[in-house]
């Protein structure tokens, strides 16, 4: 059994914050928004909505494209750090009810941030293969609008809300190959919640990513017997335009490492699957994914297209 990615579907709220407009209260120049942050708009779910609502919208988009899939789902995994009801019950249980999935479906949450999608792929693949499950869904939904301090320049200009649903199963489009994981836990305070609001030490997070992510990518390449030239696209967590472009220069992959969150912001664990869904990857044979952030943790893997 080879469980891999069959398709990826997304949901991005219709309401957005204008980053140029809100940045005026700090006297931030447009050039800083364009060239450093990179996101001119930040997506926001409605005040009446919660994490499982936007997660449901993403999964329903998947089901609309695959009519008979709902009754075949055997595993539902939700990656979030901002669950409904403070996390009890787990958001995957609430989402399971909203989606009306079978009672025999295994459901659980993963409390992971920016590295969550790649870690979730590895966990879901291993879990499904060990149990002989043929169809599962990995959901990412982490609306940071629930914890953003609107008066904190360091965080208010960065994050957007979105959700994704990745269908995992047999006969996939993308096979999940070598992975690498790690954490520098003595730096966890660089990105945490304090007094119910997100607090970030941006320089520490940047230094962490700039040092550890290239090493992780090189390890995965070495373990795979590949060189960076063998990778068609490098999809990095969309922390900001500055960190994505800095890493691309260090890796020598400027033309293959897109910044694509201009119109919705840093969507945490959803940023990488958003790219998988939106970018034209038809000519790509190998894609490298690397998520990094909260923990401070990283997770890197290679996807390889299955030739039909």
Predicted regions, residues:
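Conserved beta-ketoacyl condensing-enzyme motif
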Residues: 5, 51-108, 226-244
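Flexible, glycine-rich active-site loops centered on histidine and acidic residues
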Residues: 129-160
